[in-house]
UniProtKB/Swiss-Prot annotation:
GO terms for molecular function: phosphatidylinositol-4,5-bisphosphate binding. Belongs to the SEC3 family. The keyword Phosphoprotein does not apply. Component of the exocyst complex involved in the docking of exocytic vesicles with fusion sites on the plasma membrane. The exocyst complex is composed of sec-3/exoc1, sec-5/exoc2, sec-6/exoc3, sec-8/exoc4, sec-10/exoc5, sec-15/exoc6, exo-70/exoc7 and exo-84/exoc8. GO terms for cellular component: exocyst; plasma membrane. SMART domains: Sec3-PIP2_bind. It comes from Caenorhabditis elegans. One of its GO terms (biological process) is exocytosis. This is Exocyst complex component 1. Residues 230-257 form a coiled coil. Keywords: Coiled coil, Exocytosis, Protein transport, Transport. The keyword Transport applies.
Length: 848
């Protein structure tokens, strides 16, 4: 590029006294690629006035160049570098109303050209400078890169003073000349006029300054007088400031004395409160109170009330608002020493409560009650209620003693309820077999007319049906009695022992201190209250779960299918709203869990009995009893679960039982002691299972019904293929060997007759062994064999015989096809045709 620059400088610019400052090789101009080389040159004139110009130079033949377009720097409006963050050779120049899109040879050429153009614009065109956008502008250097020629000294002065005027300055200058009725050519006359006006103005200014000398002197005198006044004012301000300082100190002293008086008043008030509180505490407990505690009679309600008042007075003395230093006073110590009688009172109270708990429990056991009812404890509660306030006082002042009393109550009451539950559940369990026996008697006639086709120990037979009326009544009795007893005991325990009193007090204190009781705090308090109540109630009724479990086992032991009815009853009740704070909800939940376990165990037992098939040696299996047992189970379950909510558990049980039945069929078919063919056992039982499921119409078992049908058809095909070759045994063996020989040796079918063992003579010999009479005789034996393998009066006999016919006809056709393929032109045929075979099958079927 430097060589081209020198050539262009010498050919084009040197003769015009111009110097190239920057040059860029233009690859594309306005999106068009130039055939000849095009250059964009930035040049300045050497002599003054200096002018900056842009040239488009076009390359010609023979390495010559020609100036094509010329533009002055004033005409350039905008230079756009496109993207300052990305090196790109493209940039735009707007000259006049036209925008040139230029693609330089490289990004470096573009940057150097725009940088030089910016420097020249700043130096020679600062007012009408073009807009440079999307380009990192360089910092201007103190020296310029233009090196003009040496000029005379006066020319240098002209160069340094030269500043181009702006358009506004030019317009203002023309207005001034026009106002003087002059032209640009008469500028020297205008300059002389301005000089004369300037001289007249200077003279006027001097005369004005001379005339205003007296005024200036007067002004200075006024300023001096003002300064003197300011000094006097400052002295007065200093005097006032001293007075204010004295007042400020006096006020601070007064405030200090006032604060001390406030402290003194507060101290006197607090001292008065302390003394009043101390005196009230001392006066709270009198000698009569102490005497009342010493002579307490807990059997007398009036004495109990007096003891309660005395105990509250002692609590007021102990918990009064007395500061620690006041506790060291002799009056307090003396009164506190006199309260040793409280310890004796507490011991007597604990002894009385222990004896009272035991006596009341014995009294509750001695009362006669209905056999299916749990005795109510209202009398025991009324006897203990007067002591509730003393228990509350004991809980606040003697928590360890209160815990011992609570534990004694739990131990004694636990024994009471254990005995009551023993009697109640023993009577209840004895009612269960009576209910079943009465049901057996009422349905004896009905059960005699029903054939189950199952073992005699099936507890799902109609002779052992559950009592759908008595058993729900027993469950209702259990729940009603337990609910009444548990709720009454819970209310009494909470009220008598004040279980939640400290939590309520703590919650009230927290709410008062915070000014707000949030719902989160309320839920937390309720949770703690329920935990405490459940802990106490759980210890009181720890034997209840054992009795409930025994009751469920007894009901299921007399008839395991009772668990279905229990499950349905409890499933309906579990949807009813329950009080979460009641301990009975926990008991109810435990009963639901126990019944669900019994339900799962019952289904598991049924599955094991369905899948484990016991077969005597050398016996024909026939239809398994598990299928009839499964059908009876489904029928009974559908009656029990009618309109029930928990169908999901029942459908899951159906699925497991049906799978167990299928497992039993597979095990029975594979049993080594069975005389029945494996495929016969499978398709007969799968057929029976399919009929059973079709009759029951259980939607969740629809897929199992389809699978049973598919398995039946699969094993019928296997059975038919197994016994198919018996009427034509030698022919089947012959052609099986032919097919194997062709496949293993790879010879052509029409060449098989050349083998000695497969010659035409051998084929005729084999065919002659199966005349029509022999084939019919073999088919009759096959029919008898099938009839013997199937159960008596089986509906599948004709189905199997029809499949056997179709398979036999296909076999005959296949043999004829092999004869035509392997023995072409031999005219050898089987002695029985397809029509003859069909006639044989029809005659045999009609005979039987």
């Amino acid at each position: 590029m430097s060589a081209i620059r020198k050539i262009i400088q010498r050919q084009l610019f040197q003769k015009d006294d111009e110097r190239i400052q920057a040059i860029v090789n233009v690859s594309k101009l306005d999106g068009k690629k130039k055939k000849n080389q095009t250059l964009l040159c930035l040049a300045v004139t050497i002599e003054h006035p200096i002018a900056v110009r842009l040239y488009f130079v076009k390359g010609e033949k023979d390495d010559t160049f020609k100036k094509k377009d010329r533009f002055n720097l004033r005409e350039v409006r905008e230079i756009d570098g496109i993207n300052p963050k990305k090196a790109s050779p493209e940039f735009h120049i707007t000259i006049g109303d036209h925008q040139y899109v230029i693609l330089a040879g490289s990004a470096e050429e573009k940057d150097e050209f725009i940088r030089e153009l910016y420097k020249l614009s700043c130096q020679y065109l600062p007012v009408q400078m073009p807009d440079f956008c999307n380009f990192s502008l360089p910092q201007l250097e103190s020296e310029t890169s233009i090196i003009p020629i040496e000029l005379p000294e006066h020319d240098m002065a002209m160069q340094s003073d030269y500043q181009p005027i702006s358009n506004k300055e030019d317009a203002d200058f023309r207005k001034l000349i026009a106002r003087a009725n002059l032209t640009i050519g008469e500028a020297h006359i205008f300059a002389e006029m301005l000089t004369e006006q300037l001289q007249s103005l200077d003279g006027a200014n001097i005369n004005s300054m001379m005339d205003s000398e007296n005024s200036v002197n007067q002004l200075l005198s006024s300023i001096d007088a003002a300064l003197t006044g300011v000094e006097s004012v400052e002295k007065e301000l200093d005097r006032c400031d001293d007075i204010l300082a004295f007042v400020r100190n006096s006020i601070e002293l007064i405030e200090e004395k006032d604060s001390l008086s406030v402290v003194e008043r507060k101290n006197k008030q607090r001292l008065n409160e302390e003394i009043v509180s101390f005196v009230n505490s001392l006066q709270a407990v009198t000698d009569s109170h102490i005497e009342t505690l010493k002579q307490a009679n807990f059997s007398n309600p009036e004495s109990v009330q007096r003891c309660t008042d005395a105990a509250r007075a002692v609590a007021q003395f102990w918990h009064g608002r007395i500061s620690k230093p006041m506790l060291q006073m002799k009056a307090y110590q003396d009164r506190n020493d006199e309260l040793t009688a409280v310890d004796v009172f507490v011991d007597r109270l604990m002894s009385h409560l222990s004896a009272l708990f035991s006596n009341l429990n014995d009294l509750s056991l001695d009362h006669e009650w209905h056999e299916l009812c749990i005795p109510k404890q209202s009398q025991r509660f009324r006897a203990l209620s007067p002591l509730s306030d003393l228990i509350n006082w004991l809980k606040t002042n003697r928590p360890k003693a209160c815990n011992l009393v609570l534990q004694k109550y739990i131990d004694s009451t636990n024994l009471l309820y254990k005995r009551l539950f023993d009697n109640f559940f023993e009577t209840l369990i004895n009612k269960v077999p009576k209910a079943n026996s009465s049901e057996k008697k009422s349905k004896a006639n009905e059960s005699a007319n029903i054939s189950l086709r199952s073992d005699n120990q099936s507890f799902l037979s109609t002779s052992s049906e559950i009592d759908t009326e008595v058993l729900p009544q027993l469950i209702e009795t259990v729940l009603a009695e337990l609910s009444a007893v548990i709720d009454a005991e819970q209310k009494f325990v909470v009220r008598f022992f004040h279980i939640n009193s400290e939590l309520l007090a703590q919650f009230d204190t927290t709410s008062t201190g915070s000014g707000d009781s949030s719902s989160l705090g309320g839920r937390s308090m309720e949770k703690h209250m329920n935990e405490q109540v459940r802990h106490v109630m759980g210890n009181l009724f720890d034997s209840l779960n054992i009795h409930l479990d025994s009751f469920c086992r007894a009901v299921c032991r007399h008839n395991p299918s009772n668990v279905l009815l229990l499950f349905v009853i409890m499933s309906k009740k579990v949807l009813l709203p329950q009080d979460p704070s009641s301990y009975f909800s926990i008991t109810f939940g435990s009963l639901v869990v126990l019944i669900k376990r019994q339900f799962d165990a019952f289904i598991q037992m049924e599955c094991s009995q369905y899948s484990e098939v016991r077969i005597a040696k050398k016996t024909r299996i026939g239809i398994l009893p598990s299928i009839f047992r499964f059908a009876n189970f489904v029928r009974r379950a559908e009656i029990i679960f009618e309109n029930a909510e928990r169908r999901t558990d029942l459908e899951k049980a159906y699925f497991n039982l049906c799978r167990a039945v299928c497992d039993g069929i597979q095990k029975a078919a594979a049993n080594q002691y069975s005389k029945s063919p494996s495929s016969v056992v499978k398709f007969e039982n799968y057929h029976e299972l399919y009929l059973t499921l079709s009759e029951l119409k259980i939607s969740c078992l629809d897929q199992q019904r389809k699978d049973a049908k598919a398995l039946k058809e699969e094993h019928i095909d296997a059975y038919v293929k197994e016994f198919m070759g018996r009427p034509l045994k030698e022919i089947q063996t012959f052609f099986d060997n032919v097919n194997n020989f062709i496949e293993t040796r790879g010879i052509r079918p029409d060449e098989i007759s050349y083998q000695q063992q497969f010659s035409r003579i051998e084929l005729k010999k084999v065919i002659s062994q199966h005349p029509g009479k022999e084939v019919k005789k073999g088919l009759e034996q096959l029919y008898k064999k099938i009839e013997k393998n199937l159960v008596a009066n089986s509906s599948l006999l004709q189905v199997v015989w029809r499949d056997m016919q179709e398979q036999f006809v296909k076999q005959i056709a296949e043999y004829n096809k092999l004869i035509l393929t392997c023995y072409p032109g031999s005219k050898i045929e089987l002695e029985v045709s397809t029509d003859t075979v069909l006639q044989f099958f029809s005659e045999i079927a009609q005979q039987h």
